[in-house]
C-alpha cells in the first residue's frame, strides 16, 4: 500500500498480521480484489458491502484502498478492479456504491469515467492518527 500512502508504516508479516488477514478474508462483507501480472501484485482494492435498513433493506457498497503500483499505472488495471467491484455490488443487490478520493483531478476523472458522479454528496472524515 506504499503506492497509496507513502507515509504508512511498513507492515511486518507476523502472527497478528496473518490472523488479521485471515479474519478479513473470512468476512463475507469484504471483497478484496487484486490484479496479478506474472506473479506480481500490481493493483488492488476492497469493496465492503454493508447491510442496511433503508432502501427496502438493500445493502450498499463502499470501495476503498484503490491502488495500482506506480510502474503499472495507465494500463487499465485500476479500471478492471473498479468494474469488478461494481459488478460484485450489483450481484449483492446493493442500491449504490460509494467511494471517496482526495487525490488530484486526473484521479477524479478516472472515477468519473468508471461511472461515479462527483458532487452528489459531501463526505466528512474524522481521522484518529
How would you name each of these model-derived features?
Residues 1-21:
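Conserved GNAT-fold acetyl-CoA-binding loop/helix
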Residues 64-68, 74-87, 113:
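Conserved acetyl-CoA-binding loop-helix of GNAT-fold acetyltransferases
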Residues 63, 97-101:
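Conserved hydrophobic beta-strand within the GNAT/NAT acetyltransferase core sheet
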Residues 34, 40-49, 62, 67:
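Conserved beta-strand in the GNAT
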Amino acid at each position: 500500500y506504499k503506492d497509496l500512502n507513502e507515509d504508512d508504516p511498513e507492515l511486518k508479516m507476523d502472527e497478528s498480521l496473518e490472523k488479521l488477514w485471515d479474519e478479513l478474508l473470512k468476512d463475507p462483507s469484504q471483497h478484496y480484489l487484486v490484479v496479478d501480472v506474472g506473479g506480481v501484485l500490481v493493483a488492488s482494492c476492497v469493496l465492503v458491502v454493508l447491510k442496511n435498513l433503508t432502501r427496502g433493506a438493500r445493502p450498499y457498497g463502499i470501495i476503498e484502498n484503490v491502488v495500482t503500483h506506480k510502474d503499472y499505472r495507465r494500463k487499465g488495471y485500476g479500471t478492471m478492479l473498479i468494474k469488478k467491484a461494481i459488478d460484485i455490488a450489483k450481484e449483492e443487490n446493493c442500491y449504490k456504491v460509494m467511494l471517496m478520493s482526495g487525490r488530484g483531478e486526473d484521479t477524479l476523472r478516472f472515477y468519473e469515467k468508471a461511472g461515479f458522479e462527483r458532487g452528489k454528496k459531501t463526505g466528512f472524515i474524522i481521522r484518529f492518527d
